[in-house]
Amino acid sequence: MNTILEKLYQSEVLTQVESQQLFTAIITGQLAPTQLAAALIAMKVRGETPQEIAGAATALLADAKPFPRPDYPFADIVGTGGDGSNSINISTSSAFVAAACGVKVAKHGNRSVSSQSGSSDLLAAFGISLDLPAEQARQALDELNVCFLFAPQYHSGFRHAMPVRKELKTRTIFNVLGPLINPARPPLAVIGVYSPQLVLPIAETLKMLGYQRAAVVHGGGMDEVALHSATQVAELRDGEITRYQLTPDDFGLSSHPQEALAGGSPEENRDILTRLLQGKGQLAHEEAVAANVALLLKMFGHEDLRDNAQRALATIRSGKAWQHVAALAERG
């Protein structure tokens, strides 16, 4: 371990295996707080590489509580959070709409990073249990096309890093790991990142982690597909990464100002998104979710983004997505 730490102090890059060893030590409580702080800051100042991020994610997945992984295609749609936008929960809403469109989503999430309401804050406000046993969550994925996996339930090792992370008060590699450590190990994903500089490195990380198809996105300061600005995309497909931009026109949707997506407390977000998922939402909210669902449907092989967006809008306006929220809430 001292050799690995010394490499970091010399601004050298760790291999994927070394990073995995380091993070295995971190999540099993083997590092002193000063060592942990030094390692995290050394990586941050130099800039974390895809192999270091992949090694860390591999360590966390190996330590995670097991989830009975399905053999059918399923996805996650998730953002790093921390974009500072304090917007409504686009990815959480998109998961329910995608489920109502007929694809399966195992959403991995946590409490808020920078907004007043993270994905699990919202789900709790909907009355959805955050601690369903893994078998019951898998059953919900089978029968309702959607389940939610609450990060702390599966990743107990995070607790060893929490005090240091809180004291450092700055972003570290842990801020990008959340979307990469879904214990269900989905082969497909749409992952939003808080900085355009992370789009390509996270796509390269997903390749190392063995994802079949995934899109990493950043849209005008937000960790999702945006309608107020062009969205930067790095798409991984069968081991190849393609970079491109998406505009509202690519989805056949209108442009909307970022302020139109402003969120509030979990209760306020619940009320806004209840109306949206019941088919009574605001146009800006409907179209923002439709754009994100459209890209997610592409990961399942539905290649036409305009068709996908129209399908998502029709689903939103039918109120079918709300049935999935209500059915999941009934399970505990």
Swiss-Prot record:
Record InterPro entries: Anthranilate_Pribosyl_Tfrase, Glycosyl_Trfase_fam3, Glycosyl_Trfase_fam3_N_dom, Glycosyl_Trfase_fam3_N_dom_sf, Nuc_phospho_transferase
Gene3D superfamilies attached to this UniProt entry: Nucleoside phosphorylase/phosphoribosyltransferase catalytic domain (3.40.1030.10), Transferase, Pyrimidine Nucleoside Phosphorylase, Chain C (1.20.970.10)
Record keyword Nucleotide-binding present: no
GO CC aspect terms: cytosol
Recorded metabolic or biological pathway in which this protein acts: Amino-acid biosynthesis; L-tryptophan biosynthesis; L-tryptophan from chorismate: step 2/5
Cofactor: binding details: Binds 2 magnesium ions per monomer.
Residues involved in anthranilate 1 binding: G79, N110
SUPFAM superfamilies for the chain: Nucleoside phosphorylase/phosphoribosyltransferase catalytic domain, Nucleoside phosphorylase/phosphoribosyltransferase N-terminal domain
Residues the record lists as binding Mg(2+) 2: D223, E224
Keywords annotated in UniProt: Amino-acid biosynthesis, Aromatic amino acid biosynthesis, Glycosyltransferase, Magnesium, Metal-binding, Transferase, Tryptophan biosynthesis
Binding site for anthranilate 2: R165
Residues passing through the membrane, by range: none
GO BP, one annotated term: L-tryptophan biosynthetic process
Catalysis performed (reactions): N-(5-phospho-beta-D-ribosyl)anthranilate + diphosphate = 5-phospho-alpha-D-ribose 1-diphosphate + anthranilate
GO molecular function, one term: anthranilate phosphoribosyltransferase activity
EC number: 2.4.2.18
Enzyme class: transferase
UniProt: 5-phospho-alpha-D-ribose 1-diphosphate binding residues: 79, 82-83, 87, 89-92, 107-115, 119
Family: Belongs to the anthranilate phosphoribosyltransferase family.
HAMAP family: TrpD
Name this polypeptide is given: Anthranilate phosphoribosyltransferase
Species of origin: Erwinia tasmaniensis (strain DSM 17950 / CFBP 7177 / CIP 109463 / NCPPB 4357 / Et1/99)
